[in-house]
Amino acid sequence: MAWTTHKFRKNIMDSETGVIRKKWNGRIKVALVYPSTYHIGMSNLGFQAVYELINTFENVVCERSFLPENGGSDAADRITTIESGSSISSFDLIAFSVSYENDYPNLLTILEKAKLPLGSKDRGIPHPLVIAGGVAFFLNPEPLASFIDCFLIGEAEAILPRFFDAVSHDLLSQDRISCLKTLAREVPGVYVPSLYRTEYNSDGTLNAFEPIADVPHKIERLYVKDLSFTPTCSSIVTPNTIFDNTFLMEVSRGCPHGCRFCAAGFVYRPPRFRPFSILKECMEQGTSKTDKIGLVGAAVSDLPDLNKICGWEFEKDARISFSSLRADALTSELLSILKKSKTKTATIAPDAGSDRMRNVINKGISETDILDAAEKIVAAGIPNLKLYFMVGLPTETLDDVEAIVTLCKKIKHRFLKSSRAKKRMGEITVSLNSFVPKPFTPFQWVQMDDVRLLKSKIKKVKNGLKRVANVRVHADIPKWAYIHALLSRGDRKAGQILSLVNTNQGNWPRTFKSSPVNPDFYVYRERSLDELLPWDFIDHGIRKSFLKSEYKKAIQGKTSPPCVVESCNICGVCTE
């Protein structure tokens, strides 16, 4: 069914509970765009939270838009909003909410389908102002620097009120450069790429990154210091998402454990937890819409009131779910509540097969923790187990890859032993992903494994487990991990590759063959610890010396303790 049909929009809106309907009436009109399909975008709690937040501003109306269901491949596709069916090109602002780097090409597709010039320098009055935010840009916005007018670097609750206080019809009617200069000067966290100059060394590395106007030299990431007053939960519940009529609520932000591969554990510092009082308000709102509640956070297991929350949900006959739980935090109370919630699958993330590799990544759990967790899960009556692993981690050997197979077999043995007592054998699903180095982590300097090597490692795990009954292996596709790495650590020159792949209608092999920019430079090259990195202009409060220290400890196989926010100033975020 074509994206533009009235029937499609009507079916979508009829299935939604909680949609916001707001009259335009001279308000600033914002098209909030998720650069993937409705099904994916509406599964993203951050996108929903931004939609609700923008609509709380009296002078603003916000409507949602997405990539067409066919990926924009139909020449007749138009990019319109769900609420009114209006073209996004008729709005005052187009705001992209982006969580995943591999969605960058979709962003260009959407601009093109909206009949807007792709380059920021080619847009002006009467074109909409094109802005972008989301965790992908906390890390590194540079590959999209040529296409976006301004980026909002920070958490939505901290930056959006200031941004929309500054935005007015008068400001938007000014010439584009004047408008952008005003925003960059008046709103902390606003990054306007056109107001900064880059200079490169002969070897392609970055030599200089400097402002060319009276704007900040560094862009400070804004964040909410106390989550006690800012609930984040689903504004709309619909069956047309990955989570199917589930009310999502964020219970925490950031993570204290400091896994060295995990960007969320660093750019969302300090770790913060919401109190039971505000979460109870969210749960009351959620249970009025559905009986399925999903807890969202990088450190759900560390939430002080987790048992209390789960107990409250159970009293309301709600079913509760988690993204994943730490193997060393599975209490009998928690497992009992999960069973009562009719949870069929529990998820834990060993991430690596050997204790040596888990020390390298600072995972903080042992093989004993993992095996005990598997046994507890089955004993609690939860029949299925999902395990997350990575291949291609720094210092990894083939012995470490083989250790994934060995550990899975040990887990299966424990699983089988406990399942026999229950007279029921469930399934173990192994999810295998290629490691991608990310900015603002201790591994931001390392090279990524060659795609062919990653394929061979994945094959080794699959072959090692293919004859093990009730164990299934799902692996990512390394070529997409390669593109992920390119877009994660690219500089402005990587934007040329994005422009070319858009011209080639998503054909990456043809793009790489004809690109004047070598993508291997961003993917397979190990960086010097002293190199000026494309994302160094963003200030997360994390000392670069801390990341270097963590990288060196990783290579030595040494671990670091978790964050103790009240008394720690090691990384630099909590020095105030």
What are these regions (language model features)?
Residues 1-20, 32, 464-576:
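Radical SAM enzyme core and accessory elements
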Residues 30-35, 41-52, 60-63, 68, ...:
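Low-complexity, highly charged intrinsically disordered N-terminal segments
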Residues 33, 37, 281-386, 390-429:
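Conserved SAM/AdoMet-binding glycine-rich loop
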Residues 44, 241-276, 567-576:
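Canonical Radical SAM [4Fe-4S] cluster-binding loop centered on the CxxxCxxC motif
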Residues 47, 111, 146-148, 167-168, ...:
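Short secondary-structure boundary/capping segments
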Residues 67-212, 439-491, 498-509:
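Glycine-rich beta-alpha loop elements in corrinoid/cobalamin-binding modules
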